[in-house]
């Protein structure tokens, strides 16, 4: 598990056949996931998980901010976290982001997701969250302006996600998968730290959802 995994990003070419595209896209994703498994900073995850779990236990707000592709990840995060019985929201409109961040308080968590780490809207959110005393959990590439705002303070956590990707030729794919994986890690770990009555609630949700589906054929 701890062995190094060589990362080889194979760019998709215009003359690639369909079979080549399938192999390259899947290989790039698998390679990036394995590399991140070995590179992920467990101490940063521990800080983020602790802050999120404490916010969930105390009824504080957990808000996910993203724009564009990262807004889709934010929506996925909200979908996962609200099922844990916590106050979770995904905010993707830049004006609403400013308003919501302004209402943050100490103990609240603002999870800011960005592929480039250079979105002006999200940099504004990070600055407002810092001023309001909320915990900022930043999921972005290291060395970016947003990453710098996720470091250096007791209420600032950086979950760095680095990956080579050709943004000019196609929409970022590997980055989205890595961000979704980070959300899955956070959700799983936070669920294990929430009170014991969570499990019956999750079972009831599954039971009620089954009523929304057609029965399987005999």
Listing of model-derived features with the role each one plays in the protein:
Residues 192-218:
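Internal, active-site/partner-interface "lid" segment
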Residues 1-5, 22-30, 72-77, 127-138, ...:
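Short charge-dense sequence patches
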Residues 53-181, 187-194:
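Glycine-rich phosphate-binding loops that contact phosphosugars or nucleotide phosphates
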Residues 17, 24, 35, 57-60, ...:
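Context-gated lysine
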Residues 15-22, 26-29, 45, 70, ...:
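Generic structural signal for well-ordered, non-membrane alpha-helical segments
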Residues 1-43, 47:
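HTH-adjacent hinge/linker in prokaryotic transcriptional regulators
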């Amino acid at each position: 598990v701890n062995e190094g995994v060589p990362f080889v990003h194979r760019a998709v070419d215009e003359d690639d056949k369909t079979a080549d595209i399938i192999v390259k896209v899947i290989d790039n994703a698998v390679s990036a996931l394995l590399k991140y498994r070995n590179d992920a900073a467990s101490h940063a995850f521990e800080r983020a998980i602790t802050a999120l779990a404490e916010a969930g236990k105390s009824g504080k707000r957990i808000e996910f901010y993203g724009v564009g592709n990262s807004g889709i990840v934010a929506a996925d995060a909200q979908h996962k976290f609200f099922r844990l019985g916590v106050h979770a929201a995904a905010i993707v409109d830049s004006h609403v982001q400013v308003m919501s961040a302004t209402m943050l308080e100490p103990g609240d968590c603002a999870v800011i997701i960005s592929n480039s780490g250079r979105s002006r809207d999200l940099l504004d959110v990070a600055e407002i969250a810092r001023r309001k005393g909320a915990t900022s959990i930043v999921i972005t590439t290291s060395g970016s302006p947003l990453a710098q705002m996720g470091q250096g303070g007791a209420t600032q956590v950086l979950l760095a996600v680095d990956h080579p990707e050709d943004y000019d030729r196609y929409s970022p794919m590997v980055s989205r998968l890595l961000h979704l994986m980070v959300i899955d890690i956070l959700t799983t770990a936070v669920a294990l730290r929430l009170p014991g009555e969570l499990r019956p609630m999750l079972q009831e949700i599954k039971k009620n959802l089954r009523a929304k589906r057609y029965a399987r054929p005999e």
